[in-house]
């Protein structure tokens, strides 16, 4: 199994936008591996973990092949893991060409948002480009030989 980590930071990234703390200033000065984008990973070129606002930057930097990605697992609905606004580029008629179908998996709020996009003809003229599957904690998914167990993500202090 080959896992590529594109981003390993939380919502704010490192350095955080607007932040002038010592850690952020140091990361900016050092650059390279010290600059961290929002969490995202790719497994064996076909399973994307999370779809956040840094996805386009990750694509531009790491040049992964979108046509090989068959599945996208959304760990939870916070915007640093799921940024549905960019899905309009995937399903829109003007932004992308020659794309492959991707199956998205996520909790109820992720599922509901993707279904909303799929059923909005102004956003999604071609709903065959993606499907959404709702998963619950404890569900076992089998995706082309991968076995994935859905776990509850609860890290919000509120």
Question: In which residue ranges do the predicted regions lie?
Answer:
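Binuclear metal-dependent hydrolase catalytic cores
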Residues: 1-158
């Amino acid at each position: 199994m080959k896992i590529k980590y594109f981003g390993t930071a939380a919502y704010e990234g490192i350095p955080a936008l607007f932040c002038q703390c010592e850690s952020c200033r140091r990361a900016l000065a050092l650059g390279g591996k010290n600059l961290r984008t929002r969490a995202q990973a790719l497994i064996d070129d076909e399973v994307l973990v999370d779809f956040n606002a840094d996805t386009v930057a990750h694509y531009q930097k790491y040049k992964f092949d979108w046509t090989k990605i068959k599945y996208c697992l959304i760990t939870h609905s916070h915007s640093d893991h799921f940024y549905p606004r960019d899905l309009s580029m995937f399903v829109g008629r003007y932004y992308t060409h020659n794309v492959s179908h991707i199956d998205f998996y996520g909790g109820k709020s992720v599922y509901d948002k993707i279904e909303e996009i799929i059923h909005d003809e102004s956003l999604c003229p071609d709903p065959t480009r993606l499907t959404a599957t709702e998963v619950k904690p404890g569900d076992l998914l089998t995706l082309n030989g991968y076995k994935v167990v859905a776990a509850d993500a609860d890290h919000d202090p509120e």
